[in-house]
C-alpha cells in the first residue's frame, strides 16, 4: 500500500468495480430489507441534506447486506413539476421564446430533451458519495410504468369517492398561474400597515358609543370589494347589540351582515374584522360556519374583475347577490387597487387612521411573488377517510417514528387534516385522467378509449382532456410500491414491499410521509385484504445547518456543496460559485469577504469517507445538525490513522506466520485485552445501528480504532513483535491478533467508510485468513461473549494508567521522553504486585524506565513527583533529573507571559465599546482565548507549587 492515504486514488475505481459486478443488486437470499431513496428533483444537484441522507441510508443498507439480508436500495428521481418547468421556461426565455409560442406538445419535447441532458447530474453525484443503490432498478416519476400507476391510483380513488373536483381556496401563484402547496410558500417578515376603515351601519343602528359606523382594521384593503360580512367576538360587549345587524360596504354599496365568531381577536385593531371568504383562508373557514357567499373579485393575474364571481360554499353559482363591481377598478392590479381604495376611503372621510404593522407576507418560493388565496376549480383528495387507517398504523406500532417524538407532530397534523388540492396549472407532469364533453360533464378513466366505452360515448362525441397536471407529491406518494411494478403483482412487489425504513427530514412529514402512508394503505393490500403499510420505520433527521446553526442559503453565502468537500475547490472557484447570479452586488461583496475569511485557501480535498463519517457522527436526535468543517478535518485524520495502522500491520505480518491455518498460538494479556475490547465494540456498534443512533455507533468505532487499537495496542505489542527471542507461539498469537482485529474493525467500519475499508481489506484479507471478492459481501461481525475477558481488561487498564502517570510526571516536570527514569511503587496491593510481575518487561521498554521497584514496608520514599493509579502511588525520584531553580525560573517567565495575556484579553472583553461593535464570532474567539490562557495559567501555577515543594 502507498505510504500516504490518497482517497481519490481509490474511490472512483472501487465504485466502478462494485457496480460493474452487480454487488449492489439484491442477493436473492435471506430476509428482504428495502429502502427507497427519497427521489431528489431531476433538476437538482446534491446539497448537504442529500449528502447526509445518503450517508445514513448507505450505512443501513451496507450493514444489513453484511448481515445476510436480501437488500434492495432503489434509486430514482422526481420530475419536480414546477421546478423543472421553470428551468426550461427560463432557457427558452433567454432565446425570446415562451412556452405558449411553442405549444404544449413542443414544449414538453424540450423538457424531455433537457431532462436527458441534465437529469444524470444528481445520479453521478450520488455515485460519488459511494451509495450502493441498485442502479439497474433506477426509476423516474414520469417513467411509463409509474405513469400507468399514477393513472390507476387516480381512477381507483375517484371510483371510491375519494377524489372530487371542487371550487375552493388555494395558494395561487399569480406569476406562474398555478396553485402551489404550502411547502412552496415562504412567509417573509415585512413592515406594512394596518388600515382602520369606517363601515357605515344601516337601518339607524348605533354602536354602544353612539357611533353610526364600525371601524374595521385590515392589512388588505384591496380585497374589501369581496367582503361578505363584518365579524366581532361573541363575548365583546361593545358590539353585542349589533350582532345580526348590517353594515354598508363602502365603494360597492352592498349591505353585509355583522356576525359573531370566536375567530376574532378582541385585542386586534378595533375588534371588528372584515370577512372575505374568497380571498383569505381564515375567512373561508368563517364563511363555512356562517354560510356566507364566496365573492371572487380577482382574475388569475390578481387584477380586479369587471364583475365579481359569486358562489355558494358548494361551488355552485349564487344568483342571489348582485355581482357588480365599480368599473373604475376593472383590470386594476391588486396593489394599485389597494392604493386607489385607500384614497377613495380618505376622500369619503371613511379612513380613520393608518398604523405601522409587522406582517408575514406569503411569497412563492420560486416566483417570489405575493401568493393570493384564490377561488378556483381544482381536483381534491378527500383525506379524512384515508387518515383513519394511517393514524391507526402509527398508534398500534405497525409504523414507528424514530425519534418517537415526531409521532406527535404526525398525529397533530393527521387529526386536523384538510382535503388535499392535487391539481396544478402546469404542462410538465402527470396529466389528470379526466375528460369533458361539450356540456361540461366530467368523465374519469385510464384513457379516452376506456371513457368512451364505459360511458357509452360514440366517437362523434367531442371530448377534451383536462389541461391540468397532478401535484408532484401525488406521484411521489405512490413511490414505495409504484416503483416495484404496481398495479401488477410483480415478484419484486411481493418480496420487497412493505419497505423497511424511510429516511427523511422532519420538514416533509406532512407533505410526503403522511401522504405515502394514506395512499399506500388504501391502494395496496396484504394477502388477507388488510391495508399494507409503505414502510415499518420512519427515521427522521434534522436539517443540516452551518457551524453557527444558520440555515444554509445562497443569500447567506454559507452553502456547502458536499462534493466540494470530497474533491476540494480552490478559492476563486468557490467565490464564483457563492456569488454568481446574485441580484444584490453589495450582498455578493459581503459574501466574498466572509468566504475569504472562512476558507482563505479554498476547501481542501477530504475524500468521501471522511465526509460520510462526519455525517454519521452528527446524526443525533436533535432537530438541527450543525455542520462543522473542523469535524471533517478530524475524520480525515482518522482515515490517515487507519491507513497508517494498516501499513504498520502489513509491515509486521507480510510474509510472516499469522497462524491462520490453526498453528498453536499463545495470546498475551494485551492480545486478550484488545480481543475483549473488540467484542464490546461489536456489541455497541450493532446495538446503536439497530437503534438508529449513528452518532453513537460512529463514536464507539472511533474510540476503539483510535484510542484502543492505534494509540495503545499497536504500541503495547511492539516489544513482542520486535523481540527476536520471544517465543514463536507468542509472536504468532500477536501477529494473528494484530491482523484479525484490524480485519474485523474494517468490517465494522465499512458501512460508514466503504472505500478505505475495502482498499485495506483487499490488501490484508489473505494474511487474516479471509477470502472473497469484496468486503461489502463479508459477514457482519458478531460479538463472542466468551471472549470478553474482564481479567485481561483490568490488567491492561492498570498498565495504561501507570504509563499515563509516568507520562504526566514527565510533562509536568519537563523531563525528556527519551530520558530513562527510575520509578517506585508505593502502597502496592497483592494485585499490583502480580500485575507488575506480569508486565514489567513491557513497562520497562514502553515507559522508558531505568528501573521499577516496590517501596518496602517502613522504607522512606525519596523526594519524588507523584501520580496515582487507584490506591497505589507512582513515584519518580527527582534527584539528578531536574535543576530545581532553573525550572522554577522557566515557569515564572511563562506565568508572567500568560498573566499579561489574561490582562490584555480580559481588558478587551470588559470594554463595552468593543463588545458592542465587534462581530459575535470575534467576541467568541476572544472569550475562548481568555479561557485557554486562564486554564494554562492555573496548570502552570500548580506545576510550580509541586516543584517548589520538592
UniProtKB/Swiss-Prot annotation:
Where does this one sit in the cell? Cytoplasm
Keyword field? Aminoacyl-tRNA synthetase, ATP-binding, Coiled coil, Cytoplasm, Ligase, Nucleotide-binding, Protein biosynthesis
Q: Which residues form a coiled coil?
A: 881-950
- Chief location of this protein? cytoplasm
Annotated Gene Ontology cellular components are: cytosol
Q: Where does this chain carry the motif 'KMSKS' region?
A: 551-555
This protein's superkingdom?
A: Bacteria
Reaction(s) catalysed by this chain, per the record, are:
tRNA(Val) + L-valine + ATP = L-valyl-tRNA(Val) + AMP + diphosphate
Q: What does this protein do?
A: Catalyzes the attachment of valine to tRNA(Val). As ValRS can inadvertently accommodate and process structurally similar amino acids such as threonine, to avoid such errors, it has a 'posttransfer' editing activity that hydrolyzes mischarged Thr-tRNA(Val) in a tRNA-dependent manner.
Q: What is this protein called?
A: Valine--tRNA ligase
> Could you tell me which species this protein originates from?
Pseudomonas aeruginosa (strain ATCC 15692 / DSM 22644 / CIP 104116 / JCM 14847 / LMG 12228 / 1C / PRS 101 / PAO1)
Could you tell me the gene encoding this protein? Answer: valS
Amino acid at each position: 500500500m502507498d505510504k500516504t492515504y490518497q482517497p481519490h486514488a481509490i474511490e472512483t475505481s472501487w465504485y466502478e468495480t462494485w457496480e460493474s459486478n452487480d454487488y449492489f443488486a439484491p442477493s436473492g437470499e435471506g430476509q428482504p430489507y428495502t429502502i427507497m431513496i427519497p427521489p431528489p428533483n431531476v433538476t437538482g444537484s446534491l446539497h448537504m441534506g442529500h449528502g447526509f441522507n445518503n450517508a445514513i441510508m448507505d450505512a443501513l443498507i451496507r450493514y444489513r447486506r453484511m448481515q445476510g439480508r436480501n437488500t434492495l436500495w432503489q434509486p430514482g428521481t422526481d420530475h419536480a413539476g414546477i421546478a423543472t418547468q421553470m428551468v426550461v421556461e427560463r432557457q427558452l426565455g433567454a432565446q425570446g421564446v415562451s412556452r405558449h409560442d411553442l405549444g404544449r406538445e413542443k414544449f414538453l419535447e424540450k423538457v424531455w430533451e433537457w431532462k436527458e441532458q441534465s437529469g444524470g447530474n444528481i445520479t453521478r453525484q450520488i455515485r460519488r458519495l459511494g451509495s450502493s443503490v441498485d442502479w439497474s432498478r433506477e426509476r423516474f416519476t414520469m417513467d411509463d410504468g409509474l405513469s400507468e400507476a399514477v393513472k390507476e391510483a387516480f381512477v381507483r380513488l375517484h371510483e371510491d369517492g375519494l377524489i372530487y373536483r371542487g371550487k375552493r381556496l388555494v395558494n395561487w401563484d399569480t406569476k406562474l398561474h398555478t396553485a402551489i402547496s404550502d411547502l412552496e410558500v415562504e412567509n417573509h417578515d415585512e413592515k406594512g400597515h394596518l388600515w382602520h376603515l369606517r363601515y357605515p351601519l344601516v337601518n339607524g343602528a348605533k354602536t354602544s358609543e353612539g357611533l353610526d359606523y364600525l371601524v374595521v382594521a385590515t392589512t388588505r384593503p384591496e380585497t374589501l370589494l369581496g367582503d361578505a360580512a363584518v365579524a366581532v367576538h361573541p363575548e365583546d360587549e361593545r358590539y353585542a347589540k349589533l350582532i345580526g345587524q348590517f353594515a354598508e360596504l363602502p365603494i360597492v354599496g352592498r349591505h353585509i351582515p355583522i356576525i359573531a365568531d370566536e375567530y376574532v381577536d378582541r385585542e386586534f385593531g378595533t375588534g371588528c374584522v372584515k370577512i372575505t371568504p374568497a380571498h383569505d383562508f381564515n375567512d373561508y373557514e368563517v364563511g363555512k360556519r356562517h354560510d356566507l357567499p364566496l365573492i371572487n373579485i380577482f382574475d388569475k393575474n390578481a387584477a380586479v374583475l369587471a364583475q365579481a364571481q359569486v358562489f355558494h360554499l358548494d361551488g355552485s353559482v349564487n344568483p342571489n347577490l348582485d355581482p357588480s363591481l365599480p368599473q373604475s377598478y376593472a383590470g386594476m392590479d391588486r396593489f394599485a387597487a389597494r392604493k386607489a381604495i385607500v384614497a377613495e376611503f380618505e376622500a369619503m372621510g371613511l379612513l380613520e387612521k393608518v398604523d405601522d404593522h409587522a406582517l408575514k407576507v406569503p411569497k412563492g418560493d420560486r416566483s417570489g411573488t405575493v401568493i393570493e388565496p384564490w377561488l378556483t376549480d381544482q381536483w381534491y383528495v378527500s383525506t379524512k377517510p384515508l387518515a383513519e387507517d394511517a393514524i391507526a398504523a402509527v398508534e398500534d406500532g405497525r409504523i414507528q417514528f424514530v425519534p418517537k417524538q415526531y409521532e406527535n407532530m404526525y398525529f397533530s397534523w393527521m387529526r386536523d387534516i384538510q382535503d388535499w388540492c392535487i391539481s396544478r396549472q402546469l404542462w410538465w407532469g402527470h396529466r389528470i385522467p379526466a375528460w369533458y364533453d361539450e356540456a361540461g360533464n366530467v368523465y374519469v378513466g385510464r384513457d379516452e378509449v376506456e371513457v368512451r366505452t364505459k360511458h357509452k360515448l360514440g366517437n362523434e362525441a367531442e371530448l377534451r382532456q383536462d389541461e391540468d397536471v397532478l401535484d408532484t407529491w401525488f406521484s411521489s406518494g405512490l413511490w414505495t410500491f409504484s416503483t416495484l411494478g404496481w398495479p401488477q403483482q410483480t415478484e419484486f412487489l411481493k418480496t420487497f414491499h412493505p419497505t423497511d425504513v424511510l429516511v427523511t427530514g422532519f420538514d416533509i412529514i406532512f407533505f410526503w410521509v403522511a401522504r405515502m402512508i394514506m395512499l399506500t394503505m388504501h391502494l395496496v393490500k396484504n394477502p388477507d385484504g388488510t391495508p399494507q403499510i409503505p414502510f415499518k420505520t420512519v427515521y427522521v433527521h434534522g436539517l443540516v445547518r452551518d457551524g453557527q446553526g444558520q440555515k444554509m442559503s445562497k443569500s447567506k453565502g454559507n452553502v456547502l456543496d458536499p462534493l466540494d468537500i470530497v474533491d476540494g475547490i480552490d478559492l476563486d472557484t468557490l467565490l464564483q460559485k457563492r456569488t454568481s447570479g446574485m441580484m444584490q452586488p453589495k450582498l455578493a461583496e459581503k459574501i466574498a469577504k466572509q468566504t475569504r475569511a472562512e476558507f482563505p485557501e479554498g476547501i481542501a480535498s477530504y475524500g468521501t469517507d471522511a465526509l460520510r463519517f462526519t455525517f454519521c457522527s452528527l446524526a443525533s436526535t436533535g432537530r438541527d445538525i450543525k455542520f462543522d468543517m473542523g469535524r471533517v478535518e478530524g475524520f480525515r485524520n482518522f482515515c490517515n490513522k487507519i491507513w497508517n495502522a494498516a501499513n504498520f500491520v502489513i509491515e509486521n505480518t507480510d510474509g510472516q506466520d499469522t497462524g491462520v491455518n490453526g498453528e498453536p498460538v499463545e495470546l498475551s494479556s494485551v492480545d486478550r485485552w484488545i480481543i475483549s475490547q473488540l467484542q464490546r465494540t461489536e456489541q455497541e456498534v450493532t446495538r446503536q445501528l439497530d437503534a438508529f443512533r449513528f452518532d453513537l455507533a460512529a463514536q464507539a468505532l472511533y474510540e476503539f480504532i483510535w484510542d484502543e487499537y492505534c494509540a495503545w495496542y499497536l504500541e503495547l505489542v511492539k516489544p513482542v513483535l520486535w523481540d527476536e527471542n520471544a517465543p514463536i507461539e507468542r509472536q504468532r498469537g500477536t501477529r494473528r491478533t494484530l491482523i484479525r482485529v484490524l480485519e474485523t474493525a474494517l468490517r465494522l467500519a465499512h458501512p460508514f467508510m466503504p472505500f478505505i475499508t475495502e482498499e485495506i481489506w483487499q490488501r490484508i484479507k489473505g494474511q487474516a485468513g479471509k477470502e472473497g471478492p469484496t468486503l461489502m459481501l463479508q459477514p457482519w461481525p458478531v460479538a463472542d461473549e466468551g471472549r470478553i475477558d474482564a481479567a485481561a481488561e483490568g490488567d491492561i487498564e492498570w498498565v495504561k494508567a501507570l504509563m499515563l502517570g509516568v507520562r504526566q510526571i514527565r510533562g509536568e516536570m519537563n523531563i525528556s521522553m527519551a530520558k530513562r527514569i527510575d520509578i517506585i511503587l508505593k502502597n502496592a496491593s497483592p494485585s499490583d504486585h502480580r500485575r507488575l510481575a506480569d508486565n514489567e518487561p513491557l513497562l520497562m521498554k514502553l515507559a522508558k524506565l531505568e528501573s521499577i521497584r516496590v517501596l518496602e514496608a517502613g522504607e522512606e520514599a525519596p523526594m519524588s513527583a507523584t501520580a496515582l493509579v487507584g490506591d497505589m502511588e507512582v513515584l519518580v525520584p527527582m534527584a539528578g533529573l531536574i535543576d530545581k531553580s532553573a525550572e522554577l525560573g522557566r515557569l515564572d517567565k511563562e506565568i508572567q507571559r500568560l498573566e499579561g495575556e489574561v490582562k490584555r484579553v480580559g481588558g478587551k472583553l470588559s470594554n463595552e465599546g468593543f463588545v458592542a461593535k465587534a462581530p459575535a464570532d470575534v467576541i467568541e474567539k476572544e472569550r475562548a482565548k481568555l479561557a485557554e490562557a486562564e486554564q494554562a495559567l492555573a496548570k502552570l501555577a500548580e506545576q510550580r507549587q509541586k516543584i517548589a515543594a520538592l
